[in-house]
């Protein structure tokens, strides 16, 4: 069964593949007092690939809250931004996470994975999309590059609540990362979202400092901070003397202003930034309407 490949013609507006019995979904669960309630259905994705340890930690943290469906890229799409694949077909195959959890892997981008699920690849209604856990912070303008964040953005475009979760280890950390704190915080955020809901065009960008949970000072709701990029153009020559280029440089820094995501993490706090899809520069709107646009 695991070698079955689903062929998804790109550009279809609606399509449906019946995956039963691959990912059975319980429709009714029970509260602690024995009353029936509807079980929520969460789609989990990421940009590091379906085999990434951060995704596994997230799935394990959320598995007792809701029915979980995993649909993630089959390889790393870090810094891919918001992608919609329109000029080639997308393929999806069944796989297993390291703990044996069934999952689906696509050769599309993170935002493609969310679109596939919402447009019919997953039969059951999805209530929430959670993307992560990314092994690096997504702070300030990082959100425009991040496949983790733009997967959540894709859900918000379709009117679904969504959460992107990233861990922010300091530069130079060696060896496998410990995702336990970030996974626990992700669960806490998801519990609040399931309880309160989110406005239709809003999603959350969550960043967690690389600290034991006991050392986390708290949770702050923040605005985006100012990220400072130190990119460099690196020129190389191939064996035939033809130039090629890498975009490289040092890791970005940020301005830890009070009330920002960067400032929160610098102070040992979890940052939760509500984000929306309207990129209009509201402060400039009326001013620019007063310009002499019709002047000869």
What residue spans do the PLM features occupy?
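Glycine-rich phosphate/pyrophosphate-binding loops
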Residues: 156-178
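Hydrophobic alpha-helical signal peptides and transmembrane signal-/tail-anchor segments
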Residues: 5-23
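A cross-family phosphate/adenosyl-ligand binding-site feature
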Residues: 42, 53-125
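Short, Lys/Arg-enriched N-terminal segments with co-localized hydrophobic residues
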Residues: 22, 26-39
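Alpha-helix C-terminal capping segments
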Residues: 117-123, 150-161
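Glycine/threonine-rich flexible loop motifs
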Residues: 137-146
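Electrostatically charged, flexible surface regions
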Residues: 177-296
């Amino acid at each position: 069964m695991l070698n079955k490949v689903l062929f998804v013609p790109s550009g279809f507006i609606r399509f449906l593949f019946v995956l039963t019995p691959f990912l059975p979904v319980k429709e009714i669960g029970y509260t602690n007092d024995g009353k029936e309630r509807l079980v929520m259905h969460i789609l989990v994705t990421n940009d590091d690939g379906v085999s990434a340890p951060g995704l596994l930690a997230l799935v394990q943290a959320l598995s007792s809250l809701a029915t979980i469906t995993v649909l993630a890229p089959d390889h790393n799409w870090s810094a891919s931004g918001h992608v919609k694949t329109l000029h080639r077909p997308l393929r999806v195959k069944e796989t297993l996470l390291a703990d044996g959890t069934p999952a689906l892997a696509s050769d599309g981008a993170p935002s493609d994975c969310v679109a596939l699920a919402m447009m019919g690849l997953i039969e059951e209604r999805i209530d929430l999309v959670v993307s992560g856990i990314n092994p690096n912070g997504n702070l300030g303008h990082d959100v425009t590059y991040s496949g983790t964040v733009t997967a959540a953005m894709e859900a918000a475009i379709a009117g679904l609540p969504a959460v992107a979760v990233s861990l922010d280890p300091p530069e130079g950390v060696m060896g496998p990362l410990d995702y336990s704190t970030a996974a626990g915080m992700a669960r806490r955020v998801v519990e609040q979202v399931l309880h309160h809901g989110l406005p239709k065009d809003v999603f959350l960008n969550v960043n967690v400092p690389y600290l034991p949970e006991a050392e986390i000072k708290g949770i702050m709701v923040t605005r985006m901070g100012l990220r400072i990029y130190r990119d460099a153009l690196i020129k190389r020559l191939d064996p035939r003397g033809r130039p090629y280029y890498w975009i490289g440089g040092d890791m970005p820094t940020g301005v830890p202003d009070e009330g920002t995501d960067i400032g929160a993490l610098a102070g040992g706090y979890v940052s939760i930034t509500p984000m929306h899809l309207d990129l209009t520069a509201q402060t400039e709107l009326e001013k620019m309407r007063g310009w002499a646009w019709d002047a000869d």
